[in-house]
Amino acid sequence: MVMVISVFVSNAQTVIKGDISTATGKDIVSEAMEHIGTPYRYGVSNPNRGFDCSGFTSYIYKQMDISLPRSSKGQFQKETEITDPRQLKKGDLVFFKGRSSRSRNIGHVGIVTNVNKETGEFSFIHASCSKGVTITKSTEKYYAKRYISACRILENSEDVEPFWIPTFKIIE
């Protein structure tokens, strides 16, 4: 009798997860909170120099052995899109239009820190041009009118279970 063990990891094309990352949404948020007050710097993803929005999210996820694309638009994963904000979990990425509220293009990204499951209101941590790394509520007028969508990078955004699932098959 031979036992075969296989591991399945999400196959999102632009997200590369470490072999056995056990990161949770709480881990992501905890790491992100360590950088509150870090200044905004366009094109930078270094905690000693500053962050822009996508540099911040890619840096935080990289600390959990998960590589994200460097742009906010590139970080959006259509296959894991969350259309109902009440379904958001800690660690999910939220996307907004850029400075022009008329644009339909993604221009800003943040990480969900808290969600009201009844109303869909959420707070998120992000690198703001004016405040650096900060926490903002989704109800703030500037962001409320620019919200586009969200996506889940971690399969266990709020849970403590690892995102890999071992499967066993007995071959006789």
Q: Model-found features: residue ranges?
A:
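Bacterial Sec-dependent N-terminal signal peptides
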Residues: 1-15, 19
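Catalytic cysteine-centered active-site loop
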Residues: 16-19, 38-90, 100-101
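N-terminal hydrophobic or amphipathic helices/low-complexity stretches enriched
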Residues: 13-32
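Extracytoplasmic
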Residues: 35-37, 89, 107, 119
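Aromatic- and glycine-rich peptidoglycan recognition patches
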Residues: 16-20, 82, 106-172
